[in-house]
Amino acid sequence: MRIIMATYTTSDFKPGLKFMQDGEPCVIVENEFVKPGKGQAFTRTRIRKLISGKVLDVNFKSGTSVEAADVMDLNLNYSYKDEDFWYFMHPETFEQYSADSKAVGDAEKWLLDQAECIITLWNGSPISVTPPNFVELEVVDTDPGLKGDTAGTGGKPATLSTGAVVKVPLFIQIGEVIKVDTRSGEYVSRVK
């Protein structure tokens, strides 16, 4: 019996595509097709290794094939954290998955109880946790904004209920709830 592995060529490349590189699943962060005046066309990519988290710049000759990564993305709800692991539950089957600090990474500061996250599994184990694109968090510490103080940077640091620190407008006060984009870590709006 022959096992046929799925492959992608450089024409299939787009951000978010997962493939195998040096025996490790990777995801394309950025890609650009380059046709130089002389020589063969190539695709310039920035990839992130899903297990080690390393970000690399890799060039592929036009038409090169890569093996698809056998990874699975699941929408799971964040449940709780103990000393070593973060626990996520499938909303329909109630199956639990535990992710270590390497898999959670920077997502820790955006995890709220019951927030739906995307967990990437490889060989049945979580290797990556992606929080929701937007979260609503309470401001627990920030400098008071002085009325009329609009000179300068136009923002101030604020510590949120999860421990994350983001730059917010001067009018934001302690106790207010704000919406934050988890992909960039930037303030989006005040929640009414």
From Swiss-Prot:
SUPFAM superfamilies assigned: Nucleic acid-binding proteins, Translation proteins SH3-like domain
Keywords noted in UniProt: Cytoplasm, Elongation factor, Hydroxylation, Protein biosynthesis
Post-translational modification: May be beta-lysylated on the epsilon-amino group of Lys-38 by the combined action of EpmA and EpmB, and then hydroxylated on the C5 position of the same residue by EpmC (if this protein is present). Lysylation is critical for the stimulatory effect of EF-P on peptide-bond formation. The lysylation moiety may extend toward the peptidyltransferase center and stabilize the terminal 3-CCA end of the tRNA. Hydroxylation of the C5 position on Lys-38 may allow additional potential stabilizing hydrogen-bond interactions with the P-tRNA.
Subcellular location: Cytoplasm
Pfam families hit by this protein: EFP, EFP_N, Elong-fact-P_C
Gene Ontology terms: biological process: peptide biosynthetic process
Modified residues (N6-(3,6-diaminohexanoyl)-5-hydroxylysine): 38
The keyword Disulfide bond belongs to this UniProt entry's keyword annotation: no
Primary location recorded for the protein, binned into one broad class: cytoplasm
Primary role: Involved in peptide bond synthesis. Alleviates ribosome stalling that occurs when 3 or more consecutive Pro residues or the sequence PPG is present in a protein, possibly by augmenting the peptidyl transferase activity of the ribosome. Modification of Lys-38 is required for alleviation.
Family in the record: Belongs to the elongation factor P family.
NCBIfam families: efp, PRK00529.1
Name listed for the protein in its UniProt record: Elongation factor P
Taxonomic source organism: Mannheimia succiniciproducens (strain KCTC 0769BP / MBEL55E)
Lineage, opening ranks: Bacteria, Pseudomonadati, Pseudomonadota, Gammaproteobacteria, Pasteurellales
Protein encoded by which gene: efp
